[in-house]
């Protein structure tokens, strides 16, 4: 009975998401065999040019620079919707090419994770957006504490938008393949130390936030946000965009 109830809840959740124009992303990580990174990259680059040359079949790759996954590659598919998930497109030739020409250089890989981009908490994240580097912040929400997290992230986005923040920020929440209380905040940039700025003011982000939402709002909302997160989940890693292993749009 518990399994049946859980299945019904998940079906209702996914059906609701399907109706609201969800923007779907997928990602996984892989590790090249020792001493085989160059051969892997050469083979993967050929595969990318052959099978992933358009926006419809595009894939993006990042080198993970630190943390427990240092040295691995993050492969990402984005800007999709439910039509992509429901597609019956035959990809057997592409998959066979990978098995025959690339997989021999791969030591291990994770399973796919499916994400939904949280548009109302994202800023300057468009198909035309490009950047060389990215900070990936992983967080896990305590059960039942979504409201405090959503409240703070949503208000921050409103500050970004109103005051023309130049940074690139995207928030993604797991839909499948992992803990559904997990989300990531991705910040794209082209130079370390320059994530973004508010060009029209000298005020701090906290001051702008308080102007919009009331005295001490930033401190109060940030405290509630932090208390809503699992302590073990607060990790950040650097990723560098790998153009050779990515679709050139």
Whereabouts are the PLM-identified features?
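Bacterial Sec-dependent N-terminal signal peptides
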Residues: 1-22
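Short S/T/G/P-rich N-terminal loop/turn motif that feeds into the first structured element of a domain
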Residues: 18-249
């Amino acid at each position: 009975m518990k399994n049946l109830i859980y299945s019904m809840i998940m079906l209702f959740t996914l059906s609701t998401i399907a109706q609201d124009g969800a923007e779907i992303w997928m990602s996984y990580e892989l590790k090249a065999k020792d001493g085989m990174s160059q051969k892997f990259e050469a083979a993967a680059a050929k595969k990318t040019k052959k099978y992933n040359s358009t926006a419809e079949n595009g894939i993006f790759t990042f080198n993970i620079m630190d943390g427990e996954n240092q040295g691995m590659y993050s492969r990402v598919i984005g800007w999709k919707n439910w039509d992509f998930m429901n597609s019956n497109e035959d990809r057997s030739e592409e998959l066979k090419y990978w098995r025959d020409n690339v997989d021999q250089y791969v030591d291990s890989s994770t399973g796919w994770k499916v994400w939904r981009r949280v548009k109302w908490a994202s800023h300057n994240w468009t198909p035309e957006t490009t950047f060389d580097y990215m900070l990936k912040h992983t967080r896990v929400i305590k059960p039942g504490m979504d409201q405090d997290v959503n409240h703070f992230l949503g208000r921050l986005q409103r500050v970004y938008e109103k005051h023309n923040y130049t940074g690139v920020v995207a928030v993604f929440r797991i839909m499948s393949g992992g803990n559904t209380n997990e989300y990531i905040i991705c910040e794209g940039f082209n130079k370390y130390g320059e994530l973004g700025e508010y060009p029209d003011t000298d005020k701090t982000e906290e001051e702008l936030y308080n102007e919009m939402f009331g005295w001490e709002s930033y401190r109060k909302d940030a405290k509630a946000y932090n208390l809503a997160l699992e302590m073990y989940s607060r990790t950040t890693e650097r990723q560098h965009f790998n153009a050779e292993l990515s679709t050139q749009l």
